[in-house]
Amino acid sequence: MARGMKLACVVLVICMVVIAPMAEGAISCGAVTSDLSPCLTYLTGGPGPSPQCCGGVKKLLAAANTTPDRQAACNCLKSAAGSITKLNTNNAAALPGKCGVNIPYKISTTTNCNTVKF
């Protein structure tokens, strides 16, 4: 549990540093990290996402209702994915579908967030 909290804090700090220069009212990496922190077990190879995880995914999708918001969220997800050392890339890519939502890109370190539109 302590290791997970430490990792979540590291992800939060990284996201805040990455998103700060591009923020103009867009979603913050802090919000993205907070919404998706219950997904950490699944993203590192654990069993299917928890109801709390899927609730966070749905909350994030509802909050990202403009192109800048979606691009900011994408950049936060991309950065967070790169900072999780044991990231299961298949689970990361499958997360939205497992939670019953559709986003127009894969959660991946190679996603081009500039092409994400509302």
Swiss-Prot record:
This is Non-specific lipid-transfer protein 2. Disulfide bonds join C29-C76, C39-C53, C54-C99, C74-C113. The keyword Disulfide bond applies. GO terms for biological process: lipid transport. Belongs to the plant LTP family. Residues 1-25 form the signal peptide. Plant non-specific lipid-transfer proteins transfer phospholipids as well as galactolipids across membranes. May play a role in wax or cutin deposition in the cell walls of expanding epidermal cells and certain secretory tissues. Binds saturated fatty acids, jasmonic acid and, with highest efficiency, unsaturated fatty acids and lysolipids. Gene3D superfamilies: Plant lipid-transfer and hydrophobic proteins (1.10.110.10). Keywords: Disulfide bond, Lipid-binding, Signal, Transport. SUPFAM superfamilies: Bifunctional inhibitor/lipid-transfer protein/seed storage 2S albumin. GO terms for molecular function: lipid binding.
